[in-house]
Structure formats: structure tokens, C-alpha cells
Design a protein with these regions (language model features):
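Membrane-proximal envelope and lipid/glycan-remodeling enzymes
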Residues: 1-423
Length: 423
């Protein structure tokens, strides 16, 4: 007896729920002991964005004091990071203050984890479904994107590894930025590889850019795809509106703080009393945050430098070398972006997405160094790793390739588990 369409639909939904539940369980079981989500804590005392949200509630832009990377400009202290986390904290603190005046401005940990980390498995799963994977394989790839990349140790900086590097990193803003950006990048992929509503890709761009500024370069494939839609004008308008909003708020905040919409304030971290000022001083005595001279060294670390492997009384250990480590060693799956280059190049959408990662990578390579918090991995690879995985997804599904991918996954999980104790 052939089941009715309604019965089949119910069965598919039940299977989908079970697969997602298993994906979340796998992430919790694998990452939980080292990431320690229950220990995540964020408040104005340990995070610049949270401190700025408190300042917004008081009707000001200035911070009460210097903590972490903050800008000292005209005698005032300002947050210099993109605004997404500030907006999230502002909404939460405003709501809790309205409900219970005098309540401490501390994020309720389960809700904090739910907003920052919980969307990623679901959205990564949908991104890989849109990329061409079936229901089961999309879950495997989503797990790889989380446990098989440096997203694992980056998230560990907020929980288990925070104690190893000092309490100031219990809400290390750089880690939170990378994690939030994954949500935005996944949404971009879901839309551009799916129905191409364009406003949804624009929303993903906003989330990613308000977390990591270099992700704004993904507006290039969004606008290019909008230009090539059958209803060009409508698609461009739907894409341009969120792109404009993405620019407007950070630009307005920059203008209000530093008098220039293009001035992020980052160079004002390095005032004359900052011991790291020498890192960014050029021959002219001025601060230079970007430079072509940084490219060779950073490129070597991102793509060539091997990890350090050694044996202790506890067994085999892997750690960083220099201290960054090339992405291929921890995540060998990315080698397929080179092996399958001709394949993804023939797909116009995948091609333009992959091409957009080139300026994203190059801007990161021009950034002054060293890159903090990257022992055994290179955290800037998170700005494009999800894009690369989506580009090669259709060619990971063959019988032979699946076994190769599973072997890569086993190695990657072992690798990032091994370095999870290295801040």
C-alpha cells in the first residue's frame, strides 16, 4: 500500500526533527566538555560591547574606563567593535531593566548561548541542504563546520579555555564576533543557493558585517546575483536596502564617536601609553593597521605553517607553531576546494561566492599582527570556511568521497580536540 502524501510529509518532518536533534546532541557531546556553555558569561565588566550597551542605556557613547581593546580619543574611551553584540546587549539590558529596575546587567547564560551559538547548527544544516546535500549528509557537513574547523577552539575561549588565559577572555569579544558571523554567512548561503529572495541574503550580510567588518565584501556576490535575476530592479532594491542599513549604523556610530564614518577607531587603541604601539608604527611614526608587508608572513601562517606534534606522558599532543597553523592541517576537507576548482567554477553562484573570499582573505592578510588567540589554528579562516564548504558540497556526496570526508572529519575532530587546551 502506497502511503498518502500527507503521511509521507509527516514522516519526512519527523525524520528532519530526529536528524537535527542528533546534530545538536553530537555538538553538545563533542564540544561541551571543552567549550562549557554553562560557563559563558558576559557583562559590562568583561566585554566592550556590553559596556557600550550600558552606556547607550545611560544616553552616552563613552565607556567608563579602558578594558580590553578600546579607543582613547580626545580624552574619551570608546568601543571600536562592530555593533551587533552591542545591539543585542542593549535590547536585552533594556528589556530586563524595564521588567525589573535595578537588576544587574548580566546576560542570562542560557539565553546568551541560545542567541550567540544555538542558531549555527540549524543554519549550517540548511546551508548545506541548499548546497546539494541530502538530509543526512547535510547534518554531517554541519557537524564538520562546527567540530572540524577552528570554530571549536574559538568558542572554547568563552568557556573552558577562558580560565587558562585570564578572566578577561571569559567574554572575549573576538571569539563572539567570529561565532555571530557564522550565523550571517550561513543565511547568505541559504538564500543565494536557494530561493534568492535577496533581502534574506542582505540580512545575513548585516549580521556577518556587524560582527566582522571584512564580511561586508560579500555584498559583491549578493549584488551581482541580484543584478542577474529575471526581475532585476526588484532584486536590486531588496538587496540594496539591507546593504544600506548594514553601512548606515556603523557609519553613524563612527561619525558620532570619531567625526568620520570610515574611522572605526581601532588605531586609537594604540595611544602613546600602549606597549603594543610599536607593532603598528610605520617608518613615518604614524599608526598603520594595514600593509602589504604583512601579507607574506600571514599567508605563510594561514596556508603553509604545520602544527607541532609531540608526545607526552599523556600521549600524542598537537599544538600551534609560531603560533598560527595552516588551515589544511586541521581541516583537510578544504583541500577539495583546490581539487574541485574546475567543478565549482562552472557554477556561476559558487564561482562568485568563492571569488568574493579572495578579497576577504587578502584584507585579513594585510592586517597587522600577530593574530591573537590562534594557537594551532588561524581564526581568520572562519571568515570564509563556511563559504568554501558550501562550494564543494555537491562533490562530497559520492560513495568514495563520503568515506574520504568521514576520514577527514575524524582527523579534524581529533585535531581540534587535541588543541582545545591551548588558548
Amino acid at each position: 500500500m502506497t502511503p498518502s502524501p500527507a503521511t509521507t510529509e509527516i514522516g519526512n518532518r519527523v525524520r528532519w526533527v530526529i536528524i537535527l536533534a542528533l546534530l545538536y546532541c553530537a555538538c553538545l557531546v563533542t564540544l561541551g566538555p571543552t567549550v562549557q556553555f554553562s560557563q559563558w558569561y558576559i557583562g559590562p565588566d568583561n566585554n566592550q560591547a556590553a559596556a557600550e550597551a550600558e552606556a547607550w542605556l545611560d544616553g552616552r557613547l563613552t565607556l567608563p574606563g579602558r578594558g580590553g581593546d578600546t579607543a582613547l580619543y580626545n580624552g574619551q574611551v570608546y568601543n571600536i567593535f562592530p555593533p551587533l553584540l552591542t545591539v543585542i546587549c542593549f535590547v536585552y539590558y533594556g528589556a530586563t531593566s524595564w521588567l525589573n529596575d535595578g537588576m544587574p546587567l548580566v546576560f542570562f547564560t542560557p539565553l546568551y548561548v541560545l542567541i550567540v551559538a544555538a542558531p549555527i547548527p540549524l543554519l549550517a544544516y540548511y546551508a548545506f541542504r541548499r548546497s546539494g546535500a541530502d538530509t543526512h549528509w547535510a547534518a554531517v557537513l554541519a557537524f564538520y563546520a562546527i567540530a572540524g574547523t577552528c570554530l571549536w577552539p574559538v568558542a572554547g575561549m568563552l568557556g573552558g579555555n577562558a580560565a587558562m588565559v585570564g578572566d578577561n577572555r571569559a567574554a572575549w569579544i573576538y571569539s563572539i564576533q567570529h561565532i555571530l558571523a557564522q550565523t550571517g554567512l550561513a543565511i547568505i548561503l541559504i538564500d543565494l543557493l536557494g530561493r534568492r529572495r535577496m533581502w534574506l541574503a542582505g540580512l545575513g550580510l548585516l549580521i556577518a558585517t556587524w560582527s566582522r567588518q571584512t564580511c561586508f565584501l560579500y555584498c559583491l556576490p549578493i549584488l551581482w546575483i541580484a543584478w542577474n535575476q529575471p526581475q532585476r530592479r526588484r532584486a536590486l532594491i531588496l538587496a540594496a536596502i539591507p546593504v544600506a542599513i548594514t553601512i548606515a549604523l556603523p557609519g553613524g556610530l563612527n561619525w558620532a564617536k570619531f567625526g568620520n564614518p570610515l574611522e572605526t577607531g581601532y588605531r586609537h587603541i594604540f595611544d602613546v601609553d600602549n606597549p603594543n604601539r610599536r607593532i603598528v608604527l610605520g617608518a613615518d611614526g604614524d599608526v598603520h593597521l594595514f600593509g602589504l608587508g604583512h601579507v607574506p608572513g600571514h599567508a605563510k601562517e594561514m596556508f603553509l605553517v604545520p602544527p607541532q606534534v609531540f608526545t607526552t606522558h599523556q600521549g600524542l599532543r598537537i599544538t600551534g607553531w609560531g603560533p598560527r597553523t595552516a588551515l589544511w592541517y586541521g581541516s583537510p576537507l578544504f583541500l577539495f576546494t583546490l581539487i574541485d576548482a574546475r567543478r565549482w567554477w562552472r557554477d556561476s553562484v559558487r564561482r562568485v561566492l568563492m571569488l568574493a573570499t579572495i578579497p576577504v582573505i587578502f584584507v585579513g592578510l594585510m592586517w597587522h599582527g600577530p593574530i591573537e588567540g590562534s594557537s594551532g589554528y588561524y581564526r581568520y579562516t572562519l571568515d570564509y570556511s563556511l563559504i568554501w564548504m558550501a562550494a564543494i558540497t555537491p562533490w562530497t556526496t559520492g560513495p568514495t568521497r563520503r568515506w574520504i570526508v568521514l576520514a577527514c572529519l575524524a582527523w579534524s575532530v581529533f585535531y581540534f580536540y587535541s588543541i582545545s587546551g591551548n588558548p
